[in-house]
């Protein structure tokens, strides 16, 4: 084991307990910042139609996941198809052809490494 690895493990051991205590407080106890952000969060939830105290079933979670993935797939496909017309395209990259665009977007969505 190298000197760098030993230092890394020692650092992990030293910060494990303080970091664990901090995370416990951050997730399970009300803090000062919650008084500021809770009303803002409530407004965002109300406008979005989210019921924050209601847990999702597996069916509603799966539906939400599929809807978000479909939306991201559409947005990504659209961006890659019109990239030539977008501002800040300094390299003047041309639009991708449809099948290559679809392949690229699906590989991003599924985290596929096509090498």
Swiss-Prot record:
One GO cellular component term of this record is:
plasma membrane
Matching InterPro entries: KdpA
- Note whether Transmembrane helix occurs among the keywords: yes
This entry's Gene Ontology molecular function terms read:
P-type potassium transmembrane transporter activity
User: What membrane topology is given?
Assistant: Multi-pass membrane protein
Family annotation (Pfam families)? KdpA
Top-level taxonomic group:
Bacteria
Q: Recite the UniProt keywords alphabetically.
A: Cell membrane, Ion transport, Membrane, Potassium, Potassium transport, Transmembrane, Transmembrane helix, Transport
Transmembrane parts of this sequence: 8-28, 60-80
**What subcellular compartments does it reside in?**
Cell membrane
The answer to whether keyword Iron-sulfur applies is no
User: Predominant location of this chain?
Assistant: membrane
Query: Self-association or partners: how does it assemble?
Result: The system is composed of three essential subunits: KdpA, KdpB and KdpC.
The entry assigns this protein to a family as follows: Belongs to the KdpA family.
Q: What does this protein do?
A: Part of the high-affinity ATP-driven potassium transport (or Kdp) system, which catalyzes the hydrolysis of ATP coupled with the electrogenic transport of potassium into the cytoplasm. This subunit binds the extracellular potassium ions and delivers the ions to the membrane domain of KdpB through an intramembrane tunnel.
What is the protein named?
Potassium-transporting ATPase potassium-binding subunit
